[in-house]
A protein has these predicted regions:
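Conserved, structured core segments of small domains
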Residues: 1-98
Length: 98
């Protein structure tokens, strides 16, 4: 099974979105993410975390495992981040010579 790095992109940084959200919006957002991770099940290798820095368009990451990038994209249907941005799916390759 291959591993895939997901990069969560949006026009506004994760820190800016969180700073502008009410506590209720933050709780609802976390509930949606928790529900998605539960649905993805054993495909989730690392739930990831928010990120900061760079050009601000990457707000976080996760690592999933699946048979193919298409299988990952299928898992991403209904992902809460797609309401505010896009998700890059990058296969993590073994180091050269490994």
């Amino acid at each position: 099974m291959a591993k895939f790095l997901l990069l969560y992109r949006a026009d506004q940084s994760a820190a800016e979105r969180m700073a502008q959200a009410t506590p209720e919006q933050q709780a609802a957002g976390m509930q949606a993410w928790t529900a998605w991770f539960a649905k993805a099940g054993e495909a989730v290798v690392d739930g990831g975390a928010p990120t900061a820095g760079g050009d601000g368009t990457i707000g976080g990451y996760s690592i999933l495992q699946a048979d193919s990038a298409d299988a990952v994209r299928s898992l991403l249907e209904g992902h809460p981040h797609t309401e505010i941005g896009t998700i890059d799916v990058l296969e993590i390759l073994p180091p050269p010579g490994a």
